[in-house]
């Protein structure tokens, strides 16, 4: 069984061994069903949405002969944090239906939009009295940084041909609000809210708050490589204006293991700035620790950099609270075009931790420049 990712299972199949694929990244059903963990029943951490379950390809990069060694897929629902049958059912459903399609659908038939728009298992769940998550009926929002415009572009989808209306000021969308007809360009701080108005049914809602700083929407380049499991959208996650919740698998955090964070942001050279703040995450039970230091550099040509600020971070203690840490550094006002932020990983996991001496993860999110 390949639990910690897919690499072990793929390697085993290539060596001629039979494999069951059950990677935690896609099939741990004790992970939250939504990145909005505060609105979900309690879970062990992480996030596995139903569309992420569906997206898994257990036979990727294998020849037909090697594919024969993939016996199937399996989901795991560890019950340390499952308090009742209702809680267990909620964590299973409807992700179990998505898992079934991963197992049984031929590649030519498997299609997320078909599955989402044709999903009717909720009727059976209700008839049987099961408790289940309803995120498949919700609004799926995704966004990307447009460095040419210095903006964030929001894209929305939902089940079926249902009208979506949105606002940018945090007010509740109504049928009189602008109707979503295509990607929405956001060029300044906004409280984006959207509602899918379902006739005779429960409306779906989506919200995302963007807090723009002078770095938001700017071109950014990673000079070091994040861990393959936690690369997601890359450097743009650091300059998208969204301050993520403390869920490291939500797709809004970059995770580093073998290298430090080293990112260069093109500030354009048109406006001055004098402070930088970096957001990081600590989840000691998942081997995620604060950085050991954060350093800021500036340059006019993108080649020759000068250090302007740094902060040393004490080694984490067992009693330190997990969650988001913010490291803010001030320096003499500059209009240097290029800004570099380097966050060093802790040298090793502290002696008090079960993973003592091993490498810990460094997770980073927004870089705020003012």
Question: Where would I find each of the regions flagged by the language model?
Answer:
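Substrate-binding groove of N-acetylhexosamine-processing glycoside hydrolases
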Residues: 1-164, 213-225, 233-235
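Short loop/turn positions at the edges of beta-strands in beta-sheet-rich folds
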Residues: 4, 158-160, 188, 267-269, ...
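Active-site lining segments that contact anionic ligands and/or coordinate catalytic metals
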Residues: 16, 68-72, 151, 181, ...
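Beta-sandwich strand segments
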Residues: 96, 202-204, 351-357
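Short, compositionally stereotyped local motifs that mark structural "simplifiers"
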Residues: 110-264, 281, 290
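Solvent-exposed beta-strand/loop surfaces of large extracellular or lumenal domains
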Residues: 170-179, 308-322
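Aromatic, loop-rich ligand-recognition surfaces of beta-strand-rich domains
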Residues: 245-309, 313, 323-370
């Amino acid at each position: 069984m390949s639990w910690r990712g897919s690499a072990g299972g793929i390697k085993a199949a290539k060596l001629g061994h039979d494999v069951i694929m059950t990677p935690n990244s896609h099939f741990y059903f004790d992970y939250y069903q939504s990145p909005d963990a505060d609105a979900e029943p309690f879970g062990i951490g992480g996030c596995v949405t139903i569309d992420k379950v569906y997206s898994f390809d257990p036979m990727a990069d294998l020849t037909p002969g090697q594919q024969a060694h993939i016996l199937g897929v399996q989901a795991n629902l560890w019950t340390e944090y499952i308090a009742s049958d209702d809680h267990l059912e909620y964590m299973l459903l409807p992700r179990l239906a998505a898992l079934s399609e991963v197992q049984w659908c031929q590649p030519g038939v498997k299609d997320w939009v078909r599955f989402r728009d044709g999903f009717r298992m909720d009727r059976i769940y209700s008839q049987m009295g099961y408790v289940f998550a309803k995120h498949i009926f919700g609004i799926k929002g995704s966004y990307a940084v447009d460095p040419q415009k210095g903006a964030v572009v929001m894209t929305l989808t939902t089940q079926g041909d249902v009208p979506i209306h949105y606002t940018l000021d945090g007010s509740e969308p109504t049928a009189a609000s602008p109707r979503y007809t295509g990607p929405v360009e956001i060029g300044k701080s906004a409280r984006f809210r959207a509602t899918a108005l379902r006739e005779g049914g429960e409306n779906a809602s989506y919200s995302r708050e963007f807090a723009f700083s002078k770095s938001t929407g700017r071109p950014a380049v990673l000079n070091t490589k994040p861990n393959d499991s936690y690369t997601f959208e890359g450097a743009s996650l650091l300059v998208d204006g969204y301050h993520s919740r403390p869920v490291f698998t939500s797709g809004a955090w970059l995770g580093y293991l073998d290298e430090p964070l080293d990112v260069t942001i093109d500030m354009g050279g048109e406006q001055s700035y004098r402070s930088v703040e970096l957001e990081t995450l600590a989840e000691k039970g998942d081997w995620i620790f604060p950085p050991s230091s954060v350093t800021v550099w500036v340059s006019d040509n993108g080649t020759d950099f000068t250090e302007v600020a740094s902060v040393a971070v004490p080694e984490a203690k067992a009693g330190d609270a997990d969650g988001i840490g913010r490291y803010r550094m001030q320096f003499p006002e500059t209009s240097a075009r290029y800004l570099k932020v380097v966050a060093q990983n802790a040298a090793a996991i502290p002696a008090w931790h079960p993973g003592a001496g091993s490498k810990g993860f460094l997770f980073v999110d927004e870089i705020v420049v003012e």
